[in-house]
Amino acid sequence: MNTSHLINCRLVPAASALLFLIACSAEKNETPVPSFNGDRAFSYIEKQVSFGPRVPGSDNSVNCQKYLIDFFDSLDATVDTMQFVHVDKITGKPITMVNIIASFTGYDEDNDEKYILAAHYDSRPRAEYDPDSTKRNNWIDGADDGASGVAVLMELGNLLASQRARVDIDMLLLDGEDYGRPGDLDEYFLGAKDFVLRDVKDKYKFALVIDMIGDKDLRIYREEHSNKYSPEFTDRVWKIAAELGETAFVDSVKHAIYDDHLSFMTIKLPAAVIIDFDYRYWHTTHDTPDKCSPESLASVGRVVATLLYRL
């Protein structure tokens, strides 16, 4: 992902206040939210990184794909893959990439709402910000930038398998998000760009992207595009974070970020991203599991889990 420089409560009469309180209570699902296990989520980061850098088209990527498919299969999710070929602009080499979709059906048989939770599982084929200039063409592990978002989705999958939400949830594991070269957006977000071409707009109400949320020093600000184009849903996320006392979520806008959520916006599907863009090890060979923490994963996981079980 890249960054750009683009872009109350009030007093009411007693009767209205009572209705307000009832409405607020009704918004919350009475079913308790299952406990998000940050330690288990962290182990999923370690497992993904153990395959080596998950650069699109590599054996490492294929092995990680199999692991993720088997994982969600074991939860009895409906798992599908979407394969596409990207031709590298510079080398002309065709690269096969694969998106993975794990679908969890809600318990409400009358429900026709479906939501996307998305994260990219690929890691970057270059480390242009590495302090060691001799390593800037190295592939990176992508523990935070890649594996952390997927790890949160995996643990949320455990929760949904043990206790269904009311609505249908599709977990979308995207390939090719971070393939591009600096300064050229054409070869970023390749999995998301392919996905939105597949007549998906009317199938979903909202897409929430989770990216770079494993940092030990976690600080998540509202992202500018999300806040501008999907304010209602963004407000809902930060309201839940405040309610839960998750202080890593900062209630102000800081960055305008190019990430997978913008691809959903191109088809007018409301979307937002949860991301900590102040990660010191971004696009370096130092983006390794020791820079991440179970506590950070759990903070994000609790917020998103609460959101899911209130939809």
Predicted features along the sequence, with ranges:
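A non-catalytic alpha/beta surface segment that caps or lines the substrate-entry region
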Residues: P32, P53-Y107
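Catalytic-core environment of secreted peptidases
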Residues: G38-F51, L75, P94, V98-A161, ...
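N-terminal capping segment at the start of a domain
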Residues: S25-Q65, L75, R280-T288
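Acidic/histidine-rich catalytic neighborhood of metal-dependent amide-processing enzymes
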Residues: N137-E232, H261
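Active-site-adjacent substrate-binding region
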Residues: V85-V87, D215-L311
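Second-shell loop/turn segments in exported
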Residues: E30-S35, S50-D59, V87-T91, K135-G146, ...
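C-terminal motif of bacterial Sec signal peptides marking the signal peptidase cleavage site
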Residues: L21-A23
